[in-house]
Amino acid sequence: MPNETNVNIGNAGEYFVAGELERRGFTVAVPMSNVKDFDILAIDRETHKQIAIQVKTTGYKQKKWTLSKKNENLIGDDIFYIFVSLNELDTPEYHIVPSKIVANTIKESHNKWLETPGKKGQKHNNTNIRVFLDNEDLFFDK
């Protein structure tokens, strides 16, 4: 079970994203309880296009987010991840990534990690943990 600080950081990220989407012309619904696979549902007020959003948040000035193996299979044309860096007291940063790119990236990087020897030359054990990095700001929303 996640600790209270992580839950608060996650909730803050979801509400920052919801506010930003509203500001950009979307009508947003944030479910009151956990919904499998999605944190936010949004509808473009002009086109009426609907999208589902998975929000992942870090409270630090880093561009690394933890996911799980199940995220390798969460793929759809209308599914997006918004990775949030709360940056402590600075303005949050948003990295917007289509689900297909996230799924492929975390699968490839995990397989590469498994093939790379550990610090002492040992083989890595397979886990359900996956990591998404955007150190080069390829998906940074300016």
For the regions a language model picked out, list residue spans one by one.
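Mixed-charge (Asp/Glu-Lys/Arg
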Residues: M1-K36, L41-K142
